[in-house]
């Protein structure tokens, strides 16, 4: 049994021991700036927090995404206030038309606050946008896990299932 790397490298969790090995969150100021970018495009993301819950306020995401979150979804009146009280690991909108996400993804990339992944979604149809802290990715999470466990492999084999795995698969 090996730990799971989750939220595109933002979280590594050992389910066997029920222990978080590491997590990388946004600063509270980054949360505000990222939300401003989403709002400027008329979008409201879901926020994945370090407390294992997902927060949303009238989220712009697919019905399937909300159903998949299930009872871990907490609806709030104000994402700005919520983002100042929690450690946010990931902003997410899944299963939407490309035209809804292309420009916000570019603005997030240009901001220097975030590492957005925009990809064709095979599960929820349409396209999905996940946003990790700057310089955080599935590959950086793998490298961080290797350092955390003092593991020095001669090579690493990875398996991907979505467009947000491409960077990891090219290493």
Predicted regions and their residues:
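Conserved acidic, metal-coordinating active-site core of Asp-based
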Residues: 37, 41-43, 48-159, 163-168
């Amino acid at each position: 049994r090996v730990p799971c790397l989750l939220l595109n490298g933002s979280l590594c969790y050992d389910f066997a021991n029920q222990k978080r090995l590491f997590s990388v969150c946004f600063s509270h100021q980054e949360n505000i700036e990222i939300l401003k970018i989403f709002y400027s495009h008329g979008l409201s993301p879901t926020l994945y927090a370090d407390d294992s819950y997902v927060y949303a306020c009238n989220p712009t995401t697919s019905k399937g995404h909300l159903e998949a979150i299930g009872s871990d979804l907490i609806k709030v009146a104000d994402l700005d206030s919520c983002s100042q009280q929690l450690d946010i690991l990931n902003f997410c909108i899944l299963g939407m038309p490309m035209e809804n996400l292309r420009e916000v993804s570019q603005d997030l990339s240009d901001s220097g606050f975030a590492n957005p992944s925009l990809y064709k979604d095979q599960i929820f149809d349409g396209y999905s946008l996940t946003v990790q802290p700057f310089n955080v990715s599935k590959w950086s999470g793998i490298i961080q896990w290797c350092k955390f466990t003092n593991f020095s492999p001669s090579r690493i084999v990875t398996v991907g299932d979505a467009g947000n795995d491409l960077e990891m698969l090219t290493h």
